[in-house]
């Protein structure tokens, strides 16, 4: 699909589905055994014979300040058990967790080289109870979805040197400009999430609280993808009085849980009907679209008539006078019915010709992030075989960095561009943000003393701890008398509020990441950077350590090349390296990539590259021409415009006929008067 097609409706379609569901897609998984902690702000669990320790703090930024939960019976009170945190052991990372019940958490742990997902086992029929949680690493997945939109090395923020020191990162803007750059504060697209009865009954186990926690954790994970992105890269000189478009994400303003099906067969919450996805989204827009939200999202667990469809969204345009759709959409009228089409939908159930099965956490993140991206204005980068003038810049070959994140084809991430947005994608979303952020984006929930983050004006912050296990920090976020630090904020701090000595290991080493143990310095609460292990030591995926960095296999000193993916489909599933002259070729020995690893146009299966994810694209206006009723609806909706065009064409036609007649008369008059040596010139009516 070419970028100039300016598509407005995006289908995220699963091209190839496997029938053995969870165990096929997750090659290695294990139950999680959570351990009770004596401190509310710490969670312990075991996974694959390793102990994980995560320090938690409340996750406020995912919520709007007026957050509410409704069912069909009215407003509900649901406790907030959502957290972000820092992984302390076995290695540094960042966590997004939600507590389903006591000592039961779901969410994701983001490490520099992998992500650990924790999710309930009951949707996959691995258990009938709420309690059992299954864990798996992304590296053990064999998915049929594009993995390129997920957090990778350059998109997830880590503080490896000091995972306990959680100072909020502020955008560097002079204080005299802060009051003039509202978008630095108004950085959240407010959401209304509507969970229909299918999602409520299947994923929520008929419990409003569980549904709410599922949805909040989902948006928190999506924010981990969006908020690190700087949409103004290369355009900082054009900011002109506003702040940088960074830390732009989502906040939930309202959750609506439909705890029983609607009796009307035409209602979007009808449980018996099998919907066409376009019709479902349209009915949802009539019922729930609203100017009070940036986006309104239908979350369902139903399948559709269109096999393998997982989501549908309207793409946003940068100007209000252009076609409505996506974020901050204006009001539209269809056949006398008013609707706001700032709507999208996603399902948590995959449907193939062979079977249906629930998506895993990773797949849900991809579907939702993909649809939100289109709602923000992103389309696909042009394909290499297109005639788009931007194809060279936005879809470079492997020799020039590889395909970008918004490529139509999945990428593993070997090339530099695989984790970046192309100039085309950045421009599209940036243009939409420039035109619309001020109309419907709102301020991220503000911080305060007690959120576990050491911010400007604070010396410490005990966060959610309410016990008196540590008396280093008072309720005003000031250090107690005689205290030098707080162990809840500084890893090199003892329980007696003093600095650890210079032999205390504050960050265990990880040989696979080429890092040795980091030790405290004895005069600071911060943990110094971890020193490197010896050069030449083996690290991840057959790589080699050099100056504390894990070089990929192809970049080992003994090989001296670059990692790449062979573009030739016949060679794409072999281990390839790029020579200094730019040629990407397989390494000797016929070394093949394992199943599930990304290749040039999808992922490898049985040593072949299989094309997996396709976005079927249609223009929004074409929806109404699908049927005869759609044509009549379109005519009724746009009758004034059609009438103007019709009469304009008639007027132009009459004008042309009159002008032709006048010109013909002039020529005849001039010819017949020539013998009398007189010339009759007819006045030009023009």
From Swiss-Prot:
Xref: InterPro entries: ADAM10_ADAM17, ADAM17_MPD, ADAM_Metalloproteinase, Disintegrin_dom, Disintegrin_dom_sf, MetalloPept_cat_dom_sf, Peptidase_M12B
Annotated membrane topology: Single-pass type I membrane protein
TM annotation in the entry: 638-658
Propeptide residues according to the Swiss-Prot or TrEMBL record: 22-177
GO molecular function annotations of the record: metal ion binding; metalloendopeptidase activity
Leader peptide range in chain numbering: 1-21
Cofactor(s) this protein requires: Zn(2+)
Disruption phenotype: RNAi-mediated knockdown in a sup-17 (n1258) mutant background causes sterility with abnormal oocytes containing endoreduplicated DNA and impaired spermatheca function, and production of 2 anchor cells. RNAi-mediated knockdown in a glp-1 (ar202) constitutively active mutant background restores fertility.
Compartment annotation: Cell membrane
PROSITE patterns cross-referenced by the UniProt entry: ADAM_MEPRO, DISINTEGRIN_2, ZINC_PROTEASE
Cofactor comment text: Binds 1 zinc ion per subunit.
Enzyme nomenclature, EC number: 3.4.24.-
Keyword field contains Zinc: yes
Active site positions: 371
Residue sites binding Zn(2+) per the record: 370, 374, 380
Domain (Disintegrin): residue spans on this chain: 446-535
Extracellular side: 178-637
Glycosylated residues, chain numbering: 59, 206, 262, 501, 581
Main EC class the enzyme belongs to: hydrolase
UniProt protein name: Disintegrin and metalloproteinase domain-containing protein 17 homolog
Annotated source species: Caenorhabditis elegans
Name of the gene encoding the protein in the UniProt record: adm-4
